[in-house]
Amino acid sequence: MPKERRSRRRPQPIIRWVSLTLTLLSLCQPIQTWRCSLSLGNQQWMTTYNQEAKFSIAIDQILEAHNQSPFCPRSPRYTLDFVNGYPKIYWPPPQGRRRFGARAMVTYDCEPRCPYVGADHFDCPHWDNASQADQGSFYVNHQILFLHLKQCHGIFTLTWEIWGYDPLITFSLHKIPDPPQPDFPQLNSDWVPSVRSWALLLNQTARAFPDCAICWEPSPPWAPEILVYNKTISNSGPGLALPDAQIFWVNTSLFNTTQGWHHPSQRLLFNVSQGNALLLPPISLVNLSTASSAPPTRVRRSPAAALTLGLALSVGLTGINVAVSALSHQRLTSLIHVLEQDQQRLITAINQTHYNLLNVASVVAQNRRGLDWLYIRLGFQSLCPTINEPCCFLRIQNDSIIRLGDLQPLSQRVSTDWQWPWNWDLGLTAWVRETIHSVLSLFLLALFLLFLAPCLIKCLTSRLLKLLRQAPHFPEISLAPKPDSDYQALLPSAPEIYSHLSPTKPDYINLRPCP
């Protein structure tokens, strides 16, 4: 349904909104492909003003989770953003300022179907290559958006936001016919083996993902009968027909296989929601550009870089050692200075006490002499014979005081510097002696490490090489059951008539990264 607008008057900067609302309740089947075509043009003499088209719908949480799946480089990508409080999804992701482009969203009831095993590139939401042409006095840019939606219900609104100088607008939307259903021959479905179908299906998938490697689990796809009886199990993911990997192998000797479980070799095709569903094994994708079997090469460091690094490390350690030693020396010097002050105060106090003691002895001797003179004047003998007691005299020893005065200062008796061996005295300052001490210590440490270096290097290199040789591997399929087990084996290969087998219901495929 095209809409056109042409104007020959002087253009003005305006904004155009072109909206299209469709009721897809009666039109949309389980899977629909829509082709959105937009042409934008401006007058040739007014080319300085950029034009941009934005295509918006609504947001779907399924789409946001779908963005975390392992996309290949050639698969369509999108980014999530918020504009005026509403979430917006951009196809493709914006890269700088674009002259022509769009942003798209998908409703809560619709989601893109890509990538999935068995899909071709035209089934994925993607942009066609933009083209430019001249139409009269207009430059016209044309681009097509392909959307592949499923299970659409309710109103589906597409809005193009276009701004420029009176642009020429042509917009159309139409549905691409559904691909024909695969023609399965009228044969017994019990003879449809799963292994052959997997191989044929993966061969078709390789065309859609040329830059990816496809991995699968080496186990048959045991699955609950969710496709037949609409049953669910607790350890099965939402919307998946295959359970988790730990229950892909089912011991059939423990329970009846007809109660709740399905053997894919007995029935591989199912008719679900107006289409055939194909039970598939767990398949995953990996980017070949990031996964390589060749181990990364080890580049030897240049000798100049090694010497520079070693020299810088040595100089840094030497500086740290000198700084620490200088700080310790300063603290020790401060402590000695404080102790010297305390020592001087003690010596002064002792000398003063000795002087006072001498004065007391003089007073005692003077008093004794006065008493003797008084007793003799009175006609008696001296004091001691009169009282009939031995006379005592105060004798003060000065040897300890003399030794205390001969003490040298504490700074001269305590060494704060590193002592040279064999009592060498080169007349160097404390900083120079500390620096030489640090350099000699590092030199001795380096000599010690040189003796242990060969052993350490050998151990480290062997460990690193062992880790580097562990290249990523892809598991191969195993057609035989595990030995000494009760697991059922798979049936023989399928006839060549199943070469055109392809899926039409890819909801039950589990895509996850390779281990």
Swiss-Prot record:
Site positions for Cleavage: 301-302
N-terminal signal peptide: 1-33
Keyword vocabulary terms for this entry: Cleavage on pair of basic residues, Coiled coil, Disulfide bond, Fusion of virus membrane with host cell membrane, Fusion of virus membrane with host membrane, Glycoprotein, Host cell membrane, Host membrane, Host-virus interaction, Lipoprotein, Membrane, Palmitate, Signal, Transmembrane, Transmembrane helix, Viral attachment to host cell, Viral envelope protein, Viral penetration into host cytoplasm, Virion, Virus entry into host cell
Region Immunosuppression, residue ranges: 365-381
GO process terms (BP): fusion of virus membrane with host plasma membrane; symbiont entry into host cell; virion attachment to host cell
Glycosylation sites: 129, 203, 230, 251, 256, 271, 287, 351, 398
Span(s) of short sequence motif CXXC: 212-215
Domain description: The 17 amino acids long immunosuppressive region is present in many retroviral envelope proteins. Synthetic peptides derived from this relatively conserved sequence inhibit immune function in vitro and in vivo.
PTM statement from Swiss-Prot or TrEMBL: Specific enzymatic cleavages in vivo yield mature proteins. Envelope glycoproteins are synthesized as an inactive precursor that is N-glycosylated and processed likely by host cell furin or by a furin-like protease in the Golgi to yield the mature SU and TM proteins. The cleavage site between SU and TM requires the minimal sequence [KR]-X-[KR]-R. The CXXC motif is highly conserved across a broad range of retroviral envelope proteins. It is thought to participate in the formation of a labile disulfide bond possibly with the CX6CC motif present in the transmembrane protein. Isomerization of the intersubunit disulfide bond to an SU intrachain disulfide bond is thought to occur upon receptor recognition in order to allow membrane fusion.
Assembly with partners or alone: The mature envelope protein (Env) consists of a trimer of SU-TM heterodimers attached by a labile interchain disulfide bond.
Record GO cellular component, one term: viral envelope
Descriptive protein name: Envelope glycoprotein
InterPro entries xref list: TLV/ENV_coat_polyprotein (IPR018154)
Transmembrane segments: 436-456
Source organism (scientific name): Bovine leukemia virus (isolate Belgium LB285)
Topological domains, Cytoplasmic: 457-515
Residue ranges, annotated region (Fusion peptide): 304-324
Ranges of the Extracellular topological domain: 34-435
Keyword Iron listed: no
